[in-house]
Amino acid sequence: MKQYNDLFKIIHREGYIFIASFALVSFLLASFNEKLGCMGFIATAWCIYFFRNPDRFVPIGNDLVISPADGVIQEIKEALPPAELGLGDVEMIRVSIFLNIFNVHVNRIPANGKILALHYNPGKFFNASLDKASVYNERQSVLMETEQGQKIAFVQIAGLIARRIVCDLEESNEVKAGERYGIIRFGSRVDVYLPLKTALLVSKGQTAIGGETIIADFGRKKTAELQFERK
């Protein structure tokens, strides 16, 4: 029984219906046409791959902000946080992480703390790599206060293909960095909003691993933006 439980743990529950449907159709196709059946099983395997839900080695530290998603850090800029979270007109550092269809799409809590507010905003489905996606696309915004008293926000943004955002959080939840809290289906983006004086530990173009990559450290003084060299 434990083996079956472990098997289900490595696949996010949002994928169960898709995987079962793909598998059923594949068996039906295989009974009529071997090539079509083979294509169906390949699609089923891809579906399992997309909804994979791997464990991660989460860095420990109350001052740390961990990447909430797998993907490429597409942009780091100063921007206004989502108005619905009530953070006012003061700009924050926005770290945007773009997920393609091959990335793990399970999202994780970026820091230890408490959830203060949640807001779902229906919207468009522009390509998530575009800057305007942060403003116009369907999104789920979350405001939290870290254990060190810092207010940060993180936002799940639907993309061109994505059509469903899942967020399992509720207001007043006590959360830990690296905990799974949701998923965005089929291509998307996650934005993290941090206070302006936050010391960042990542750079544009870097690949982030959700639940593992440290994107900021409140315990450090802010310095010039880090520079990285490809080798």
From Swiss-Prot:
GO cellular component: plasma membrane
InterPro entries, A to Z: PS_Dcarbxylase, PSD-A
Subcellular location: Cell membrane
Keyword annotations of the record: Cell membrane, Decarboxylase, Lipid biosynthesis, Lipid metabolism, Lyase, Membrane, Phospholipid biosynthesis, Phospholipid metabolism, Pyruvate, Zymogen
Active site: 188
Pathway: Phospholipid metabolism; phosphatidylethanolamine biosynthesis; phosphatidylethanolamine from CDP-diacylglycerol: step 2/2
Cofactor note: Binds 1 pyruvoyl group covalently per subunit.
Membrane topology (UniProt): Peripheral membrane protein
Modification after translation (UniProt): Is synthesized initially as an inactive proenzyme. Formation of the active enzyme involves a self-maturation process in which the active site pyruvoyl group is generated from an internal serine residue via an autocatalytic post-translational modification. Two non-identical subunits are generated from the proenzyme in this reaction, and the pyruvate is formed at the N-terminus of the alpha chain, which is derived from the carboxyl end of the proenzyme.
Pfam families found in the cross-reference section: PS_Dcarbxylase
Catalytic class of the enzyme: lyase
Reaction it catalyzes: a 1,2-diacyl-sn-glycero-3-phospho-L-serine + H(+) = a 1,2-diacyl-sn-glycero-3-phosphoethanolamine + CO2
EC number: 4.1.1.65
Residues bearing the modification Pyruvic acid (Ser): 188
Entry keyword annotation includes Lipid biosynthesis: yes
Site positions for Cleavage (non-hydrolytic): 187-188
GO biological process: phosphatidylethanolamine biosynthetic process
Stretches assigned to coiled coil: none
Cofactor(s), by name: pyruvate
GO MF, one annotated term: phosphatidylserine decarboxylase activity
HAMAP family: PS_decarb_PSD_A
Biological function: Catalyzes the formation of phosphatidylethanolamine (PtdEtn) from phosphatidylserine (PtdSer).
Quaternary structure and interacting proteins, as annotated: Heterodimer of a large membrane-associated beta subunit and a small pyruvoyl-containing alpha subunit.
Family, similarity comment: Belongs to the phosphatidylserine decarboxylase family. PSD-A subfamily.
Name recorded for this polypeptide: Phosphatidylserine decarboxylase proenzyme
UniProt source species: Rickettsia bellii (strain OSU 85-389)
